[in-house]
Amino acid sequence: MHKIQVLLYGANGYTGELIARYAKEYSITPVLAGRNETLIRALAERLQLPYRIFSLENANQLQQQLQDIQLVIHAAGPFANTGKQMVEACIATNTHYIDINGDISVFERIKKYDAAAKQANVMLMPGAGFDVIPTDCTALHLKEQLPDATHLQLAFLPKGGQISHGTATTMASRLGEGGTARENGKLVSKPLGHRSLLVDINGKKLFTMTIPWGDISTAYHTTGIENIEVYTGMKPTVYRFLKFQFLFNWILRKQFVRSWIQQKINSRPAGPTDEQRATAKTTVWGKVWNAKGEIKTSVLECADGYSVTAWGCLLITQKIMKGDLKTGYQTPASCYGKDLILEIPKSKRIS
């Protein structure tokens, strides 16, 4: 069967809907898909796009839905619960796969399908959004400046905007789990916010703390640098509170606590408004050093995380549909280079 279509699974989520809305700007006509027929059909009718309704639970049914699909954009998280089924179906049907995951464990899991994906002649690219395009490109940019770098620090500092239901749900599902760093090539569990760092942006010292961001996995694949930490902007008062989170991890992992938090999430707006996104921006900072003590730094500015995710997914989709891809497991920068981020609107490298 000739495969020419793009399928966007999880189109009714906040980020999925953004991708669907912007698709026309990239000359892409996705098939919208998901489990909720009421929401998917309403969105499809509003955007005048085709749609399909199916779940990920039945492997045979899922593969049947992908028979005529060339590429899946997977936007239905949490990906720890949904990624495996879709990846395996894509490999079985020779369908390319990208997603908007940012979970370290999911990157590591999908990486194990590299050989199977190559044999099926398909590309697997988790993290084709804000997690991790800007930071992945910054990591490779620094690696090229200092090829023998042994340590990498990355930081992102959002200004304005707010998080979506989906992102908040993923965060809630990981409450009490702590953080992660990469040391000597190995993933090492750490307390959340085990380190703080003052990042110099245009002469201003901005406070950041460590978080378990996807680059702990992906930047290692992209650069081979064996020691990696990722930081995000945080108020010092919040950081001091989080330093003691380990005392409460046992209760944060309880289902009744997570259910209560999920109810609070569901009562909030789905995500930032178009106006909030238009004025929000993100600064990405990176630093590498080697055994000789030589140091290189880089600063990048880009739009808010949700806009970068939608534009980034569609840019990569456009490239894949033109045959511009590498088979097997890939990261955005390992496939498309350090300047991929500069092809996304409102992005510029400051240094």
Labelled PLM ranges:
Residues 89-107:
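ADP-ribose/adenylate-binding Rossmann-like module
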Residues 6-26:
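N-terminal Rossmann NAD(P)H-binding glycine-rich loop of SDR-like oxidoreductase domains
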Residues 53-69, 75-81:
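Conserved Rossmann-fold cofactor-binding substructure of NAD(P)-dependent oxidoreductases
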Residues 33-37, 55-56:
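N-terminal Rossmann-fold cofactor-binding loop
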Residues 101-122:
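Rossmann-fold NAD(P)-binding glycine/threonine-rich loop
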Residues 9, 14, 144-284, 289-290, ...:
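Active-site-lining helix/loop region of Rossmann-like oxidoreductase modules
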Residues 42-49:
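Short, conserved SAM-binding/catalytic segment
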Residues 271-351:
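C-terminal helical cap and adjacent loop that interface with cofactors, partners, or active-site loops
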